[in-house]
Amino acid sequence: MNNQYTINSLCLGKNNSLCIEIQGMILRRGEGKVTITGSLSTSAYETMVLARNILLASSEVFSQYDYHLHFAYPATQKNGTSWGLACYLLLSFISGSLAYIPNIAATGELDLFGNVLPVKYIDDKLAAWGKSQCELLFIPKNNIVPDIAGIYQVSTLRDVRDILSTKFG
């Protein structure tokens, strides 16, 4: 089992949007605990806990291991709640609950029931994504985005389970 994965999350920095890599791996057999490193604000940390708990409630496989997530660039404080979708996807990939999709980015807040909620500053986040090397972006269905069809591959999600019906390529 490959246990090292990455995903990019679009977030707001001090003066602009950033595309921050989140790295994840299985630590050992365990019970679904997640160790987190990389300068997260309280709200960003709580968002990661929410993503973990959604998986704990819906995946028997997830609870068999303990994990480590590292948010790259530790000197950059990670604020806000739009990390939720990226954390959920990364933890799903690591645990094997979802087949790994390489070279993607995600932004979206989650609620306790797995709904993907709209995020602020979507235009800025799309600009940051356009500068990245990511080929596919997952965003909330309810975010209004400029017409980017044909330029980028974007998949909109209303619920985390929507990823299962997403067509790639």
Q: Model-predicted segments: where are they?
A:
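Peripheral, non-AAA+ core regions of ATP-driven protein-machinery
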Residues: 1-169
